[in-house]
């Protein structure tokens, strides 16, 4: 469902609590500024995939076919030691929209809202209620003058407030913003989600089962080999999705004005991976590409957490992350010394 937030909401207490002020350039275009008056409104696009560990060629996986993501890594910085807080999507996405540990906001159970086949009939679903004062970080971006869109998945364990997004749904896109307005956009792809291992089982394979390397916890078996080959083929489909997102930015003349961030919500989709609090269940890839070419081709092996992504995005936008966040910014104006 497309959400349109009318102008009267901008005068609400949500905006009053933000540390970022707004000025207006000639022509009526809002521009985010810090309290010091520095312009800090780069466009930011996040491409978010599902159920992928660091099984990308640019992260050292020789089996993976990821030419677009490899090129993105060559132009940006790879974070090789970033982990989720859990091994499954909904609690991870609660963390990704708040910058909080799921346990800190009562979001650590999978799909609290219901919809789980394995849920006992007597156990009813519920929306978590965020503690007072905790917001979706996109509310702070919107307060700073950003046009914020999410396409389409939320899965936060709670319904996002109307103030979270200018648009949220399958048609949500940064192209819909008022002309000249800085944008923050998330595009989610399900191409690599767990279910695609069987849904795509008869689709084209881009990796041969004979070429995959079996982890030591799997038996030598043709079915296992094919499932892993399907997983790698789905990762290639994610690569194609990333190419589409980049091509759209380039076609609109926004590529050289946009920070692009690529990451997964949790680790792998296969047994002993997804849902497990293990290396393969929580280890994710993260790449940040800056339009000015800084840190191109570099690697950061510092220990990071998925809860660090929201404050880092705020910091990259020139917005001071709120003190309540469990995560720490590791890039941008407000990068925390303790995070580096």
Predicted regions and their residues:
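Formylglycine-dependent sulfatase
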Residues: 8, 18-340
